[in-house]
Design a protein with these regions (language model features):
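Subtilisin-like serine protease catalytic core
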Residues: 1-88, 104-110, 123, 135-138, ...
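Short, well-structured alpha-helical segments in soluble
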Residues: 93-105
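Well-ordered alpha-helical segments embedded in enzymatic catalytic cores
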Residues: 88-95, 126, 130
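Hydrophobic/aromatic-lined pockets within catalytic cores
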Residues: 36-40, 97, 149
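Sequence contexts marking disulfide-bonded cysteines in secreted/extracellular proteins
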Residues: 16-18, 95, 156
Length: 167
């Protein structure tokens, strides 16, 4: 059914939207790599060394440096369809709070990244309310804010922060 297909879950193949094999933009994958990527050596292999002892010289020699927290564990949850629409953000936030669905929040995520948002959404919309509830439980939220381009081409005037960044 449609409801089953819309249920957020770990995505084993986050680049499977387009039939040409090039993915659908890869924004979430890119953000995950920035946050917790291992890094890629000059010969194209995954870096498997000790991050605490990684020297500046070694880092400069890498094709892609490691993310900010390369030893972090990630729970990747797709909330957007292939063309950018979603009705499952709240279900995804429920999953962040209780990944195995057993009602025990002790296994919740420590941080949630929401590289998404909308303009002009009220601060009391369901997503913002959930973000505030999660904060009270100790979940730190990082959300997109003010990056919806400029207003009518007027210089450096950029959009305000909509939901969920205005939580």
């Amino acid at each position: 059914s449609v409801a089953e297909k819309s249920t957020p879950q770990p995505d084993n193949n986050p680049l499977d939207c387009r039939p040409d094999g090039f993915g659908s933009g890869g924004h979430g994958t890119h953000v995950a790599g920035t946050a917790a990527g291992y890094g890629v050596t000059a010969n194209g292999t995954t870096y498997r060394g000790d991050y605490k002892n990684l020297t500046e010289e070694q880092l400069k020699g890498m094709s892609i440096g490691p993310g900010t927290a390369p030893e972090a564990q990630l729970l990747a949850i797709r909330v957007f369809g292939c063309y950018g629409n979603s009705s499952v953000v709240m279900k995804a936030l429920d999953t962040v709070m209780d990944p195995n669905g057993d009602g025990d929040f002790s296994d919740r995520a420590d941080i949630v990244n929401l590289s998404l948002g909308g303009e002009f959404a009220p601060a009391d919309d369901p997503e913002s309310y959930m973000i505030n509830t999660m904060a009270r439980q100790g979940v730190f939220t990082v959300a997109a804010a003010g990056n919806a381009n400029n207003y009518n081409g007027v210089g450096d005037t950029y959009s305000d922060s909509g939901s969920p960044a205005n939580a």
